[in-house]
Amino acid sequence: MFYQSSSSLTQILHSFCGNTEMETPYPKLIDPSKTRIGWIGIGIMGSAMVSHIIAAGYSVTVYARDLRKTKDLQTKGARIANSPKELAEMSDVVFTIVGNFNDVRSLLLGDDGVLSGLTPGGVTVDMTSSKPGLAREIHAEARRRNCWAVDAPVSGGDAGAREGTLGIFAGGDSEIVEWLSPVMKNIGTVTYMGEAGSGQSCKIGNQIAGASNLVGLAEGIVFAEKAGLDTVKWLEAVKDGAAGSAVMRLFGEMIVKRDYRATGFAEYMVKDLGMAAEAAMPGAALSKQLFTGMVANGDGKLGIQGVVSVIRRLNGIS
């Protein structure tokens, strides 16, 4: 992510505001004591991410269909909205990180959605892994309403969310992404990828590479098992060679220990890889089949490292 000095950023804002061709005034400088944050999506990752923002001093309002999920955040100071529209009316910037693109469409573009309540000059930031085309549609509708929209899906799993070290892939207007940096720095590192939809395209590419890497790791471990090797020693032997990777560091020991706690749901990986189908990606298609096998076995809510269970079944290992 690129950062400007405060004086440099102020100059950018003043020059941007002075552009009479812009229908929407550039948003006011972010100030934790004044900028109101709205948040939709308080699952494993979302609750950790918004907790960092609350800890940084921002006033935060959350919306959840199940109010029981909001109790912990309420103890930290979060307020509750009764609908996405009401949340938007109470916010300057609204973040969403939900299950799938249908939820995104409803929450942002629906009759009672975020954009129906956001004040002109407001900003939406969708951090869900979603479709590039939907991100462009949301951006166009936001601009029609004199608001702004950024697509900013993340990578790093629940560990990255807890530690505030997520990778964030941003698409949209570069000045808006820059403007958001005082908030975004609390949850991770932003890389600006380009126009609306570019963040989502980056995330799909990330998932293709990550899933294929994870499947390869799982197959390597199962092969080592079938060969009678000590899989802990196998991991130690190969981790610093060409086969070593962040995926191996994150998931290798968990796979060996059959620890399938969710760091990212397998069913979401199926969704993400499905969005790669518009291009000829045979490796991604094979990976999708294996993760789909997890879901078919009733393991869709397990962590993505559980894909090894499908490979073990194929090899007759219980």
UniProtKB/Swiss-Prot annotation:
<comment type="pathway">
    <text>Amino-acid degradation; L-valine degradation.</text>
</comment>
<dbReference type="Pfam" id="PF03446">
    <property type="entry name" value="NAD_binding_2"/>
</dbReference>
<dbReference type="GO" id="GO:0051287">
    <property type="term" value="F:NAD binding"/>
</dbReference>
<dbReference type="GO" id="GO:0008442">
    <property type="term" value="F:3-hydroxyisobutyrate dehydrogenase activity"/>
</dbReference>
<keyword id="KW-0560">Oxidoreductase</keyword>
<dbReference type="InterPro" id="IPR036291">
    <property type="entry name" value="NAD(P)-bd_dom_sf"/>
</dbReference>
<dbReference type="InterPro" id="IPR006115">
    <property type="entry name" value="6PGDH_NADP-bd"/>
</dbReference>
<feature type="binding site">
    <location>
        <begin position="35"/>
        <end position="64"/>
    </location>
    <ligand>
        <name>NAD(+)</name>
    </ligand>
</feature>
<dbReference type="InterPro" id="IPR008927">
    <property type="entry name" value="6-PGluconate_DH-like_C_sf"/>
</dbReference>
<comment type="similarity">
    <text>Belongs to the HIBADH-related family. 3-hydroxyisobutyrate dehydrogenase subfamily.</text>
</comment>
<dbReference type="GO" id="GO:0050661">
    <property type="term" value="F:NADP binding"/>
</dbReference>
<dbReference type="InterPro" id="IPR013328">
    <property type="entry name" value="6PGD_dom2"/>
</dbReference>
<dbReference type="GO" id="GO:0006574">
    <property type="term" value="P:valine catabolic process"/>
</dbReference>
<dbReference type="GO" id="GO:0005739">
    <property type="term" value="C:mitochondrion"/>
</dbReference>
<dbReference type="InterPro" id="IPR015815">
    <property type="entry name" value="HIBADH-related"/>
</dbReference>
<keyword id="KW-0496">Mitochondrion</keyword>
<dbReference type="InterPro" id="IPR029154">
    <property type="entry name" value="HIBADH-like_NADP-bd"/>
</dbReference>
<feature type="binding site">
    <location>
        <position position="129"/>
    </location>
    <ligand>
        <name>NAD(+)</name>
    </ligand>
</feature>
<feature type="binding site">
    <location>
        <position position="271"/>
    </location>
    <ligand>
        <name>NAD(+)</name>
    </ligand>
</feature>
<dbReference type="Pfam" id="PF14833">
    <property type="entry name" value="NAD_binding_11"/>
</dbReference>
<keyword id="KW-0520">NAD</keyword>
<feature type="active site">
    <location>
        <position position="203"/>
    </location>
</feature>
<keyword id="KW-0101">Branched-chain amino acid catabolism</keyword>
<protein>
    <recommendedName>
        <fullName>Probable 3-hydroxyisobutyrate dehydrogenase-like 3, mitochondrial</fullName>
        <ecNumber>1.1.1.31</ecNumber>
    </recommendedName>
</protein>
